[in-house]
C-alpha cells in the first residue's frame, strides 16, 4: 500500500516543488481561476489551508489545482486498485497425454479440461511422443481430434494441432458467452 502511494506521489509536484512563473489554476471546487503567477497560486493554496498540486506539467502553462493532497493520493490509489480488480488474468492450463492413452483416461482428461475452460482458462493439450512413437504423428492428431470432439460445446480452437519437436500441441480457448 505504501509503495503504491509513493509511486503516485512521485508523479505530482506539490507546493514549493512547483517553480513555474505562471500556472493555470483550478480552485478546490473545480472552478477555473485562469492563469496566475506561481507565487500567487501558492499563496491562495496556503490561505485555503490546502495544497497546490501540479496536475498537468506538460501543458502550457502547467495546470495546478488547489486540493487536499493526502485525499487526492488516497483517491488515486483507490482508482488504481479498482482498475486492477477489473483486469482478468487468463492462465493457460496444460494437459499432457501420451499417444497410447486409453479411452477412459482420455475422457477423464477431457473432463478436467472442461472444468478449466468453464473457469475461463485456456487449455494447452500436449501429446508427448517418446522414441519411435514420433513416427506415428497421425495417432496424435486422432487423439487431439477425439479430445476436441468431447469439448466442442465449451471451447474453440485457438491454435490447431501442430507438431513441435517431440510434442504435438493444440490450444483451446473458452467460447465467448
Curated annotation (Swiss-Prot):
Compartments, record wording: Cytoplasm
GO biological process, one term: ribosome disassembly
Classification via Pfam families: IF3_C, IF3_N
Keywords tagged on the record: Cytoplasm, Initiation factor, Protein biosynthesis
Subunit annotation: Monomer.
General function of this protein: IF-3 binds to the 30S ribosomal subunit and shifts the equilibrium between 70S ribosomes and their 50S and 30S subunits in favor of the free subunits, thus enhancing the availability of 30S subunits on which protein synthesis initiation begins.
Protein name as catalogued: Translation initiation factor IF-3
Annotated organism of origin: Clostridium perfringens (strain 13 / Type A)
